[in-house]
Amino acid sequence: MNINTVPELIGRGSASITPGYMSGFKNSFETEALPGALPIGRNSPQRCAYGLYAEQLSGSPFTAPRGSNERSWLYRIRPSVKHSGRFAKADVGLWRTAPCHEHEMPIAQLRWDPPPLPQHEQTFLQGVVTMTTAGDANTQAGMAAHIYLITASMVDQAFYNADGELMFVPQQGSLRFVTEFGRIDAGPGEIVVIPRGVKFRVELTGGPARGYLCENYGGAFTLPERGPIGANCLANARDFLTPVAAYEDKDTPTELFVKWGGTLWATTLPYSPIDVVAWHGNYAPYKYDLRTFSPVGAIGFDHPDPSIFTVLTAPSETPGTANIDFVIFPERWMVADNTFRPPWYHMNIMSEFMGLIYGVYDAKPQGFVPGGASLHNMMLPHGPDREAFDHASNGELKPTKLTGTMAFMFETRYPQRVTEYAATSGLLQPDYADCWTGLEKRFDPTRP
């Protein structure tokens, strides 16, 4: 039925399936792990092939406009109603959900050192630490910025998030996401997006892992409009990859965790819920290699706005104002003439949480390191430090390529509140604001 199907890799209780992918961004995909598992010309036949159950997973209201209507039909061994046992509260650890007021919101620019990986075994669910929250998950608005620290795979466990969509940004170590839609492998330089309500587990594929995690409480991430840029560049739809179907038919006791209403709930099932044999639709997890992003920029003079580096946007109800923008600062050429080339000094209506995947960020060559983070909340000034300013103001303006660097930003319309962990863990750099103390008065009315 589908040229991307790899049935020879699928088996009962398969645990080591090689991931396969379909190209495109939120296409109407179809994929089956067994031939004939997908019904033809209908969604819900009287009897599904192989004794499967038909189930729809909706990521938008039924009446959403066609361009933003998201749903998939799943053909699975057991319907999800069989995945609901008697839930009990589980330890949510350091994962926090907005609104979270456990610490006051400081009027200051903030920067953190990378959190160290623990020496003990810690799975994904145990290793999420929240740095900031914004908005209100109950009203489906805002976001949270987390860091994950993983030293052990999830075994006989599954999880889904009812509160929001999850974007993983690996910084160290590679991960395998075993989802009910299929398998996804990803490492530093890639992102993975898991929609709200999709069951999955996280496995290590090569040593401990650390990275960033954006929890999007609002509308789903989508590609930004290009406007006058035209039909090409930025993130191209063909570079997004969605997994082909892969299932588990395992009668092994499995813990199912659900994040719902800011609380983590758990139940035990007598089988694996990762049991989708075939599916079709446009609501599915995907990954994207950030190194395929084609940046645009100034080829004459001046420094354009950072919005030109937007990879994905989660829009709000106000046109042009994002609930979240995911922005990257990748390798690129700097060629603008008679121009201060680093990001300029700025006060912004949006609130910016930044991280560094690898390399050096051109506006902050010192102190902002891979695995670390910074927060510049709305209307708090920020910009290059003294070293970056002096170098950019006096250096030779020859074409220069920034290489080996990948920084990113989660930008939201809502102020971001720091958590107790972010404020008191010892990672907060107390002298961050000192990076601007060396910026002295340069004004001389006698020298134009």
UniProtKB/Swiss-Prot annotation:
Pfam families referenced in this protein's UniProt entry, alphabetically:
HgmA_C (PF04209), HgmA_N (PF20510)
GO terms, biological process? L-phenylalanine catabolic process; tyrosine catabolic process
List the Gene3D superfamilies hit by this protein, alphabetically: Jelly Rolls (2.60.120.10)
List the keywords (alphabetical): Dioxygenase, Iron, Metal-binding, Oxidoreductase, Phenylalanine catabolism, Tyrosine catabolism
Q: Which cofactor does it need?
A: Fe cation
Q: Which cysteine pairs are joined by S-S bonds?
A: none
Enzyme Commission code: 1.13.11.5
Record-listed homogentisate binding positions:
361, 382
Q: 4Fe-4S: present as a keyword of the record?
A: no
Q: Show which residues constitute the signal peptide.
A: none
Q: Which domain of life is it from?
A: Bacteria
Q: In which pathway does it act?
A: Amino-acid degradation; L-phenylalanine degradation; acetoacetate and fumarate from L-phenylalanine: step 4/6
Q: Which family does it belong to?
A: Belongs to the homogentisate dioxygenase family.
Subunit info?
Hexamer; dimer of trimers.
Q: Which PANTHER family match?
A: HOMOGENTISATE 1,2-DIOXYGENASE
Query: By what name is this protein known?
Result: Homogentisate 1,2-dioxygenase
